[in-house]
């Protein structure tokens, strides 16, 4: 973690939230990748402004990033660094965002790195996704097979089942409370000492 990594992550999520819908309006993969690079530049500009105001180096705000946006025909992922995402596609569960490979163990890439644009990974899937789960690297060894890169179906089926009957509001208190209880339980906490953040979403009809 970094000194103000949480601030950097919040800024990245806010900028992505403002521009994510535009990705699905673009016709080609090249246009999507170009817009994703613009998202990176916009995020760095906002982080740089906050860092300058605080008189801190931008590296203090370093953060990894996994962003996913989907409609009835496509899924787009934008990623730099570790973390991953799984989606329920028309043909089953799929790992749609994979942790970035690095030369050394426990070393990752950050959105604030000088070569971040070169490290940015953008993927486009021509399928509908009705359920999406993004999570940090602390959960990955528990729910994704390291050798096959296959999602652990029982875990995701259980997690996605929480969305059944959830409200159509952006944030559902009941589902969030269930996830928090699950993540703080011994089956998870005894198997990882890293961050266990998770975001679960469904696409409304």
Each predicted region: which residue ranges?
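C-terminal catalytic subdomain
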Residues: 115-117, 121-205
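Primarily the active-site beta-strand->alpha-helix module of PP2C/PPM metal-dependent phosphatases
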Residues: 1-29
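Flexible glycine-rich active-site/ligand-binding loops centered on an Asp-His dyad
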Residues: 93-105
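Short, structured patches in soluble enzyme cores that scaffold and shape functional sites
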Residues: 67-69, 79-81, 89, 98, ...
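Short acidic, Gly/Ser-rich segments with clustered Asp/Glu that frequently serve as metal-coordination loops
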Residues: 1-6, 84-86, 138-146
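Surface-exposed beta-loop interaction hotspot
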Residues: 87-88, 96, 109-112
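Catalytic core of PPM/PP2C metal-dependent serine/threonine phosphatase domains
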Residues: 25-86, 119-126, 189-193
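Active-site glycine-rich loop that binds ribose-phosphate moieties when present
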Residues: 61-62, 102-124
């Amino acid at each position: 973690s970094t000194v103000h990594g949480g601030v950097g992550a919040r800024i990245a999520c806010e900028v992505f939230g403002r521009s994510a819908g535009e990705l699905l309006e673009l016709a080609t993969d090249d246009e999507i990748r170009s817009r994703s690079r613009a998202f990176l530049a916009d995020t760095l500009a906002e982080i740089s402004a906050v860092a300058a105001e605080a008189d801190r180096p931008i590296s203090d705000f370093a953060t990894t990033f996994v962003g996913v946006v989907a409609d009835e025909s496509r899924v787009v992922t934008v990623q730099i660094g570790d973390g991953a995402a799984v989606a329920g596609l028309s043909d089953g569960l799929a790992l749609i965002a994979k942790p970035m490979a690095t030369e050394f163990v426990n070393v990752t890439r950050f959105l604030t790195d000088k070569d971040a644009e070169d490290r940015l990974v953008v993927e486009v899937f021509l399928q509908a996704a009705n359920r999406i789960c993004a999570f940090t690297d602390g959960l990955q060894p528990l729910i994704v097979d390291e050798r096959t890169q296959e999602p652990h179906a029982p875990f995701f089926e259980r997690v996605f089942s929480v969305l059944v009957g959830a409200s159509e509001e952006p944030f559902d208190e009941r589902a969030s409370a269930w996830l928090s209880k699950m993540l703080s339980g011994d089956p998870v906490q005894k198997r990882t000492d890293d961050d266990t953040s998770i975001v679960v979403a469904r696409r409304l009809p």
